[in-house]
Regions:
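HhH-family (HhH-GPD) DNA N-glycosylase catalytic core used in base-excision repair
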Residues: 1-208
Length: 208
């Protein structure tokens, strides 16, 4: 992806400007496909110790993914939908994740194979449509959906307001907080003002 326009437009942004300078050139931390990112997001959900979540995910890869020869040993590939759909959630539970997470993983894999969930379409559709579709998938809440939007091979994203008991949730909360304002009291118009530097399509980036 060409982010040169974003670097130009956000150079003077009080939040993004310094970050773009400090982390210039670093690659996005994403996996090969959106399905892989969703698997990882479901497994690490509500887990504070990410190394443990990583080990759990690798056990799932070893159990259900293909084993590839690598440097004298084997490397477990991420399971594809047709491989994961046959898994028993109770067996996934034995690998570390909760039973519910196992049900989320196998259920999504079954939906993909059945054609009711289209990963290619989710990867290429506009961000708001992708967000509204992702939050309907069991195991993916508003925050996870906003995370996953940024893992697609596109330069646009969306951060809709998601208030519960008058408290802003999701990544939008932290975006507003990073600009030094109160997430719970920030209006939609004010949010648009705060993110103006990177919302323009002239910047190669679209945020909402």
């Amino acid at each position: 992806m060409d982010l040169s326009k974003l670097y130009d437009c956000a150079a003077n942004d009080p939040v993004l400007g310094p970050k773009l300078n400090d982390y210039y050139g670093l690659k996005r931390m994403t996996r090969a496909t959106l399905f892989e990112d969703i698997q990882n997001r479901i497994v690490e959900m509500q887990m504070n110790h990410k190394p443990t979540a990583k080990k759990m995910m690798y056990r799932i890869r070893e159990q259900y993914g293909s084993l590839l020869d690598h440097d004298g040993g084997t490397l477990a590939a991420w399971p594809r939908p047709h491989e994961l759909m046959k898994a028993d959630p109770y067996n996934i539970r034995a690998l570390g994740p909760t039973l519910r997470k196992g049900q989320y993983l196998t259920g999504l894999a079954q939906d993909i194979v059945a054609g009711s969930t289209d990963m290619h379409w989710l990867t290429t559709c506009d961000p708001l449509t992708a967000y509204n579709t992702l939050v309907k998938i069991k195991g993916i809440g508003p925050t996870a959906a906003q995370d996953l939007i940024m893992m697609r091979g596109r330069t646009d994203a969306v951060f809709p307001s998601n208030k519960k008991k008058n408290q802003e949730k999701g990544l939008r909360r932290w975006i507003i907080w990073s600009y030094g304002e109160d997430p719970d009291a920030t209006t939609e118009d004010r949010f648009q003002e705060l993110t103006q530097a990177v919302r323009s399509t002239d910047c190669g980036q679209e945020l909402a």
